[in-house]
Amino acid sequence: MGIAPRHMKTRTSTQNLRKRVRYHFRGNAAGSTLRLTLGCLLGLELRRVGSGGRMTFCAAGEARLSQWMAENAQVCWFEDPEPWTAESELIAQLDLPLNLDQNSHNGFHPQLKELRAQARQRARDLPVSH
């Protein structure tokens, strides 16, 4: 579950739903927690890239993840004038095992958090991928 725009008290968000969904489907794990989670669950190897500060599944892994998402992921949405409020309420009421933020009550939360932490640690232990 995600929202667009995000709640910003001092400025207007530059993100909209189309941009956020497009990035989840075409971006990489460094900028998408959804891609990071799905890639870890699929057993893709997370690696440090560039100067070593970002982590992705590299070109082949990101392509494989994009293909998996094209075949398996679905998107739905609803409009709300304050989506940040609706997000909190829905996460509290629904079983959304892939959401970590605001979702520590979910039974899968500790396992998913640990899986992602292990993937990040393995990536830190490997050389930077070029």
Question: Which residues make up each language-model segment?
Answer:
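Boundary/linker segments flanking structured domains
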Residues: A4-H130
